[in-house]
């Protein structure tokens, strides 16, 4: 504006009108002289820019303060450096946060070898296993693990526990082999964490069973044990209220004994699972 007025002779009033500023503001600007602090800030801003470029933009206002105060032998505070760097639009290179990786356990997954062919020609040829949740008392939880034989639908072994953990599943398998030490079944399960664990894989090597697993979200791939859960809950669990873990345990034990020995089905020629098992 000053150049246009001096060189072209344009009226200051017209130029101020075009610029949208008051004439008084223009004259005030002409008379403005920077204060000592403003001059100091300008000098400091120059030092900040030089140091920022020299360090390839890695300095934030804290490090900038430490380095320049030492160089200039000053005690400027952090806010001053912060304001100057913000005015100059200087930002430190942000260090990328290192991902907090938690190494996931190796999953030992098997194919769906069973492929829904559950019918077995002999006992201990095909087993299916799973864990179901049972509630008792005031919302407390227990977990029932069981193995069912595809030959006669008998419950080969079962374990009730307060915790749904590896130990529950391992004890169920060990109990089944204690009763059937020479069994070499195809043992089918879902892909729950217990069945994909290293401990389960080691148990497989120990007992030499063939591992089979359901496909993801395909509960019908494990139909025999799923059907048993439905039968057990409809005929026993849902009919009673269990105030304690011990009362639930007694009920489970009573029902499975009944199921194996006295629940007769047409599929087994009118026999119970254990009767059919002994008859052949």
In which residue ranges do the predicted regions lie?
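An active-site-proximal beta-strand-loop segment
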Residues: 120-156, 162-163
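RNase H-like polynucleotidyl transferase catalytic core
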Residues: 94-99, 187-191, 207-224, 241-243
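Acidic/histidine-rich, metal-coordinating catalytic segments
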Residues: 182-196, 271-272
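Basic, flexible linker segments flanking DNA-binding modules
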Residues: 16, 25-122, 272-280
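Active-site beta-loop-alpha junctions of metal-dependent nucleic acid enzymes
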Residues: 140, 159-180
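Residue-centric detector for conserved, function-critical "anchor" positions
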Residues: 1-11, 43, 276
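C-terminal domain-tail junction helix/linker
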Residues: 201, 205-209, 231-280
